[in-house]
Amino acid sequence: MKFSKQLSAQADLRYLNEYISYKDLKKAIKVITGSDVQVCTVQDVVSNFRQTNALTGSIFRPPESRFQELLNHELDKINSFSKREVEAILDQLAVALVIMWRLHAALTLLRLAPDSPGYAEAQALLKRLEQREQEIRNALVVYPQKRGRATEQDKAGSPSSNPRCRGVSDEPSSSSEERELGAEGDDFSSAGGKTSSRGEGDAKRRQGDEDGGEGEQDDAKRSVAEALILLEKDVLEVEGVLEAQSQEIVFLDSFVRLNFTGFRKITKKYDKHNQSSAASWYMSRVVRQDFMNLNFTLLLTRLARCYVALRSLRRRLGEQQQQSLSISPADDPSKAASVKEDRSTVGSFSQSLGPEGARLSTYKRTGGSDEGEQRREPRFSLAARSRGSRDCREDIKVTKYLIAPDELMKVKVLILKHLPLLAAGGIPMDDSVLCPFENSSQAVAAEDFSAALEAAASLLRTSGTASDKREARQSLGGSRVPTWEVYLDNEEFTYYTNTRTRRDSPDSCRGVAPSRRVVRVRWQGLPSLNSAGRQVALELSRPDSSIADPQEDITTPLASNAPDVASSAFTVILRQKQLLQLLHGLITPSKLLDQLMDEMEASAAGVATGEGANATAASHRTGARGAANRGEGSGGGGGNRGSDDRAVALTKQKRKADMLQVLQTVWDAVQQRGVSPSVRTWFYRTEFMSEDGVAWISVDEDIRFSREMNRTPPANQWIRSETEALSTDDVHPFPWGLLDVSFLVRDNGVALPQHAVQQAKDFHPLVGRDDLEDFVADLRGLSTLTEVPGFSLFAHGTAYFYTPRLQALQARMSGYEQAVHLIPLWLQYTTNAEFDDDASQVFDEATEGGKGKKADRTSVGQSRLGRNQGDSAERGQRAGSPGGLSRPRVCHRGSVIDVVHQGTSASLVHDLQASAQVSPPTSSGVDQLGNSHRPSVSESRHPSAPALSVLASAPSLPMPAPPLLEVSPFQSGARGLLTQPLLDDGDRMAGERQSASRGGAPTPSQSWLLTGARYWRRYCNCFSLSGSAGRRRRSMSCLFPWSQRSSARRIHPVGPRSMVAGGVTSGPSVRVEPKTFFANERTLLQWMNTAVLIATISITLMNFGNPVGRIAGLLMSPVAVFFIGYSFWVYLRRARALERKEPIAYNDKLGPSILVVTLMLSLSAVIALNLLYHEGEAQLPITPQNSSTSTAPSLPPSPHALPLLSQLNVSHSQAAYKAPSAPNATVNAGGYSVADVPAPDFSLSHPATAYAAATALAAAEAAAAAGPVSFAGAPERAVHAHVTEAMTHAASAETAAAEGARVTAGAK
């Protein structure tokens, strides 16, 4: 699909004029560059861009300047609309939050009795709150002009008829402005007016009920119920507004992506028409624009705050409804117990927010199972179990999905509606987001309703003023904090192999360092030049762990190793300087532990001595709450001081033992197994967790991988610097988002703690009504999600960068029963970096043909899922079969410097940069750096000791292709097609040479000694083959292996079981377009044109040239003959390969090289011959011919010569007649010379003699006259004619003299 159609299909019709004017820009480009002036006129373009100066004016301006002005016009339009939209969303969310605060105060007022002392004061306070709400709403109301220009369709049609118009009221109004205002402002005014009048009416009804006596209590309850119904309607209206703003945030993200793609497409089109390369410069300016740096983190934070308040308000409303509809215990004693139970159940939320600010401890993954604190913290967390079972996941279901980048915002907003937001973009949320009604709820729990209303009033006083304006100013340039992870492994990939070969077992969680754990270093923060003092976490982690694991929590600060702060027993917090000493063997684990314990003691005592202060006050408060929840702190009332001190001492000793064991394990791995940094990854994480700790969800975006093995970092660092510019060979941008869904299950036979089951039933509405499973099912049903079982960042990064080594290791392990597949199944579906719409268009043309072009795809999910699932499923079956490994792919466009973009739209920029990297590492035994990892014969027969140890303890783990991957978007999308290579093992030698040219280490095939020895062994083995059948064929394949590789290039359909472990798979057939055959013919004609031109020049030189020209023609004519034959051979070879769909090397490097070298040699030879001949110039005299051998014809007698004879008075006695000599008697022109012509004696006694003498005299005079003539500057042909004439006259003179002598002799 072309981008113009995609833009019109995906654009929001309300703001269609605010998008990039792609079609108008295409027309303007043709007018500016002059490529097609018939499309439109200058007046049309000017009118489209509203009188811009880009195309007008009498002063000459280059096309670049005019195009830049058009881009600036579009950028200004998009930037202004984006900022207005962000401010409008923030204003609407602020008004919604104010409304919910007022409704919360109104619910508090309903709990007061009319005869209570503070009822009148509370009622007056509520009126002031309503007035304050009205002032804030008037100040933050958003008019239609602020939200952008309305289209003609919006002005003419009804809002309800347009399904794409979001947030517009269905009530009819007189104008579009009133409709817009009703959608954005009147939704709140109705809530305010109803509540105000309802408050006064409720007070009057209550006062009437008090005067009327006890008989009218039913009417009072009925009035309270009616008031609650009206409040519920207000809550529904607020929920509708939040839903509309959620869709606005999703629309804004799509708006940014579409416009960025439009600018990228239009700049490329300008380069195409203008024959320039300015697209990169234009896009560098686009990246710095305001619309590319919108603070989506702030929008998500404000939206999450509103949804948390909405859920709290709903719980308070349900609590009040149950209290109003309940029967008094005095009237019906039988129901007193049930009423009491219901009140305790519905009041659990406010109780959980009450004492000692326990809100943060419930979100922290460190909690306790103390029975005395069950009522204070009804929410159950994963950390409530014991430490040994906390790190196991028998009762937690983990599912990981891959998300397309353009659907990340939609998924995050969907999750945010159901679960609280813990962290957005790596930034933890504060108390105002996680619990906006904390102070008010605490007062309600203490039955201090006046204090609750005063807390709500204080919140209103701080709203809509400086804080909101400050947040509005922060709508641009929102910062995010990346999470960095570095995994350590050795050259034998021991830890990676363990993770791929070992299964989960009940005993895997026993002990400090289970077999499946790997050494990992984790930290958070922006890249820094000086990071030696940064705090990092040295961990023994599971690579495939879920977000429920405490080690994956990014909200816990890496501040201290204190027991009340540490999130896991497998984590040690230390500085990077100390980590460098440990990895280099400069410090022992025991000594490092002593330093860490001293720092922990100093931090606990509040001694801030430079680097020794590792814990802040906030972390201590958080740790104190965690320790209180676990029962590790104070004894919970009644315990003596001595028992508390002993418990703290035991906890510290246990923590010290855990730290020592972790440090010792890392030390042994470094010293004995030689582990070093292998793979580094960084990403931006967004975390969600339910209030009771039943569900955890995380979304990782902008994931990038970096190679660290075989790299030499500086001496003062343990990895390469974070700010170092990395080439595309070392950085892999992962073009997908990662969704981790983890939640407790109840049907797997694992019994949860009793208090957790009771809290799940009493408190959490999702678990109680099975809505959590429904919500997860809705997530799974999204077309943009694809489940990938067993996915982990460590496995993907290692398999991507070190594919050849892993395949070589797998080949050595293939002979063992316990061998497994070391290459993950998802690798070939997720390693494509060409994430571009052009790729989708190519795939449409290649797979769907005519049907795909006619399909109407208005949805990104449909366009991604509806592409040729049959062929993709077949590819998935082939890839999912045992031993299905990727084929060699050594194709890179270059080593482009990669700059990490830190903006909010980093994924878009990274997708643009990802086009520099085409494919993952090869499987041909040569990695991207040219390092050979193909095992030798001895290695394949005798594996190393670590490999044997792995195989000895590795159970069999078959990995069939999962059904979900067979129909996943990665097989049916263009990215799966583009990852298929074009070359196979037949071009491995070329790949090795290409890899070596990038600076890699020399491979065995590059060493001529090893190459000669290998061919000699093959030659000797050829004659030792047993059997008579096929002996000749086997001998030829041994002696000439390239013939076998050439025949192996042909691809035939293979079944899913046709591949063996460790072998090389045959790729899919390449579909050839008809235009490819025409291109092959055009190439032949171009070669023939050049060859015919060379042949014409050489033939001309040989026929009409001088001796030097003839030599040059002889040199160039074989060149022309060779290229005529060579071009025809190349044409036949390519045509045959295209017909058979053979993936041969279509890039011809031999022919052009020979052509250039031959032409250079020919021209050099011609120039050399001319220079050498003129320097050694010599005269070539022409000797006179004898009379007997002369071939010149005799001159017949002529009567005109008789008068001349009378003038000659020459006696017969004269010796001879010679032509007059002169200095220029010798004529030299074109290599010819004429000498003096001797004249024999003759007499005049006979007429014939006289005629011969006259003829000889005329010839001699002609030769003498031609002698002194200068031929300098004359054409060569004219010079040649003159010389020929002179020689003819000389020959005639000689003939005449001989004839005269003969006549004289006859006369005598």
Curated annotation (Swiss-Prot):
Residues exposed to the Cytoplasmic side: 1-1083, 1132-1152
Transmembrane regions listed in the UniProt entry: 1084-1104, 1111-1131, 1153-1173
Biased composition (Polar residues): 859-871, 915-938
SPX domain sequence ranges: 1-284
Role summary: Accessory subunit of the vacuolar transporter chaperone (VTC) complex. The VTC complex acts as a vacuolar polyphosphate polymerase that catalyzes the synthesis of inorganic polyphosphate (polyP) via transfer of phosphate from ATP to a growing polyP chain, releasing ADP. VTC exposes its catalytic domain vtc4 to the cytosol, where the growing polyP chain winds through a tunnel-shaped pocket, integrating cytoplasmic polymer synthesis with polyP membrane translocation.
Domain text: The SPX domain has very high affinity for inositol polyphosphates. SPX domains may integrate inositol pyrophosphates (PP-InsP)-dependent signaling to adapt cytosolic phosphate concentrations to different metabolic situations.
Subunit structure: The VTC core complex is an integral membrane heterooligomer composed of at least the catalytic subunit vtc4 and the accessory subunits vtc1 and vtc2. vtc1 is a small membrane protein without hydrophilic domain. Vtc2 and vtc4 are related and have 2 hydrophilic domains that face the cytosol, an N-terminal SPX domain and the central core domain. The central core in vtc4 is the catalytic domain.
PANTHER family for the chain: VACUOLAR TRANSPORTER CHAPERONE 1-RELATED (PTHR46140), VACUOLAR TRANSPORTER CHAPERONE COMPLEX SUBUNIT 4-RELATED (PTHR46140:SF1)
Sequence similarity: Belongs to the VTC2/3 family.
Protein name: Vacuolar transporter chaperone complex subunit 2
Source organism of the structure: Toxoplasma gondii (strain ATCC 50611 / Me49)
